Amino acid sequence: MNVSILFDNFSMYMDGFYHTLLASVIALAGSFVLGVAVAVMRITVFKPLQWLGTAYVEFIRNIPLLLITFVFYFGLPNAGLRLDGFQAGTVALTIYTSAFIAEAIRAGIQSVSKGQMEAARSSGFTYSQAMLHIILPQAIKIVIPPLGNQFLNLVKNSSILGVVAGLDLMYQADLVSSSTLVVFDVYIFVALFYLVLTIPLSIGVNYLEKRLEKSY
């Protein structure tokens, strides 16, 4: 393995690492908030919202992430809104991941005893207050493992930015590979950078899961 490729192009790798990390953090936060909102829509008693939430999840989960990315990168300019590769990839990643997070959280909410909601309502809580303060905290504890898997998938799926010049690790690796005419070594180093992101995240999720188990 030619280590000099890493050192000679270290600034490009670090730039890609930064944009991958930034896109992952933004998409993680955005997809979690959106996923919670859609999950609540799916279990609400107001049928139009329930149908809208179900349609969103089923539609987004069953089309490729690449297609969603192309819609934002190539399609929006036709409507007068232009996003650069980083923005288009991050928005697509957020929307795509939110559908899977919504399903995980919906399952978590429905696993909480219905008596919890009834008790909260009888104590004077509104539906929104009961959901926010009573149901969701319990549901989040239950769905930490599947959420952790989705967050790990999100980091790995961030490589989609490379397809639309999103400045991420894969995009920078393509540039390095083109300039050095070396392929294998370049992408092995990229894999190591991804591990720097995913291993701490995996450890953190496992730690949080154990802490939450002790709190029961």
Curated annotation (Swiss-Prot):
<keyword id="KW-0472">Membrane</keyword>
<dbReference type="GO" id="GO:0005886">
    <property type="term" value="C:plasma membrane"/>
</dbReference>
<dbReference type="GO" id="GO:0006865">
    <property type="term" value="P:amino acid transport"/>
</dbReference>
<keyword id="KW-1003">Cell membrane</keyword>
<dbReference type="Pfam" id="PF00528">
    <property type="entry name" value="BPD_transp_1"/>
</dbReference>
<feature type="transmembrane region" description="Helical">
    <location>
        <begin position="21"/>
        <end position="41"/>
    </location>
</feature>
<comment type="similarity">
    <text>Belongs to the binding-protein-dependent transport system permease family.</text>
</comment>
<dbReference type="GO" id="GO:0043190">
    <property type="term" value="C:ATP-binding cassette (ABC) transporter complex"/>
</dbReference>
<dbReference type="InterPro" id="IPR010065">
    <property type="entry name" value="AA_ABC_transptr_permease_3TM"/>
</dbReference>
<keyword id="KW-0812">Transmembrane</keyword>
<feature type="transmembrane region" description="Helical">
    <location>
        <begin position="132"/>
        <end position="152"/>
    </location>
</feature>
<feature type="domain" description="ABC transmembrane type-1">
    <location>
        <begin position="17"/>
        <end position="205"/>
    </location>
</feature>
<dbReference type="GO" id="GO:0022857">
    <property type="term" value="F:transmembrane transporter activity"/>
</dbReference>
<dbReference type="InterPro" id="IPR035906">
    <property type="entry name" value="MetI-like_sf"/>
</dbReference>
<feature type="transmembrane region" description="Helical">
    <location>
        <begin position="181"/>
        <end position="201"/>
    </location>
</feature>
<keyword id="KW-1133">Transmembrane helix</keyword>
<dbReference type="InterPro" id="IPR000515">
    <property type="entry name" value="MetI-like"/>
</dbReference>
<feature type="transmembrane region" description="Helical">
    <location>
        <begin position="85"/>
        <end position="105"/>
    </location>
</feature>
<feature type="transmembrane region" description="Helical">
    <location>
        <begin position="63"/>
        <end position="83"/>
    </location>
</feature>
<keyword id="KW-0813">Transport</keyword>
<dbReference type="InterPro" id="IPR043429">
    <property type="entry name" value="ArtM/GltK/GlnP/TcyL/YhdX-like"/>
</dbReference>
<comment type="function">
    <text>Part of the ABC transporter complex GlnHMPQ involved in glutamine transport. Probably responsible for the translocation of the substrate across the membrane.</text>
</comment>
<protein>
    <recommendedName>
        <fullName>Probable glutamine ABC transporter permease protein GlnM</fullName>
    </recommendedName>
</protein>
<keyword id="KW-0029">Amino-acid transport</keyword>
<comment type="subunit">
    <text>The complex is composed of two ATP-binding proteins (GlnQ), two transmembrane proteins (GlnM and GlnP) and a solute-binding protein (GlnH).</text>
</comment>
